[in-house]
Regions:
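Sec/Tat signal peptide C-region and signal peptidase I cleavage site
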Residues: 19-23
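Conserved strand-loop elements at the edges of beta-sheets that form or border functional pockets
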Residues: 48-50, 87, 141
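A structural motif detector for short, solvent-exposed N-terminal "entry" segments of globular domains
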Residues: 32-74
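Structural motif
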Residues: 52-54, 82, 112
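Bacterial N-terminal signal peptides
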Residues: 8-18
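Exported/periplasmic cell-wall-interacting domains
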Residues: 25-28, 34-41, 73-80, 89-172
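Well-ordered beta-strand positions in beta-sheet-rich domains
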Residues: 45, 66-68, 82-84, 127, ...
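Bacterial N-terminal signal peptides that target proteins for export
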Residues: 1-9
Length: 172
């Protein structure tokens, strides 16, 4: 009898301790489904949440899909702020490593959504992008030099949805 009571009390305690975590997760998920009114007027909009390594794609203010991504090795590597997609390229070469576009060794995969990023010092950079990968196991981790990596299948889908000038909000 005492053993059953102890098990029941233990189960109740575990449930009570788990509820706040579940509620926080549910609230965070719900928060991500609706785009802030400030940005809801855009036909396409991307939010990248570095704290969860997730990309959220919105159309007309409604969440369409979310994806796991990889972001910077250090928090400062992936810039934060409101940017725009400036170019869409299939099979972009990896200039740093002198690897041709379409090569399986290319760490950018076969799709590149290049961002126009205003850096903290006020200069503009076109070196950051949302792209595929040659290392699918890296997705969900903090491993990049600053770009946003996606599974190749996911970035192909996103590439077909977005247009040049689509806003991209990158946040903690």
């Amino acid at each position: 009898m005492l053993k059953r009571l102890s098990i029941a009390i233990l189960a109740a305690l575990v449930l009570l301790l788990a509820l706040p975590a579940y509620a926080d997760g549910a609230a965070a998920a719900e928060q991500s489904t609706v785009l802030s009114e400030k940005y809801a007027g855009y036909s396409h909009f991307i939010v990248i949440d570095k704290s969860r390594n997730r990309l959220f794609y919105y159309q007309k203010g409604e969440l369409v899909k979310s994806f796991a991504v990889a972001t910077g090795k250090k928090p400062s590597y992936t810039p934060e702020g409101l940017f725009v997609i400036r170019e869409k390229i299939k099979n972009r070469p990896y200039y740093k490593g002198k690897i041709k576009g379409g090569d399986p060794k290319n760490p950018l995969g076969d799709r590149w959504l290049g961002l126009k990023v205003t850096l903290k010092d006020g200069t503009t950079s076109y070196a950051y992008g949302i792209h595929g990968t040659n290392n699918e196991k890296s997705i969900g981790k903090y491993v990049s030099e600053g770009c946003i990596r996606m599974h190749n299948k996911s970035v192909r889908w996103l590439f077909d949805q977005v247009e040049v000038d689509t806003p991209v909000l990158i946040q903690k």
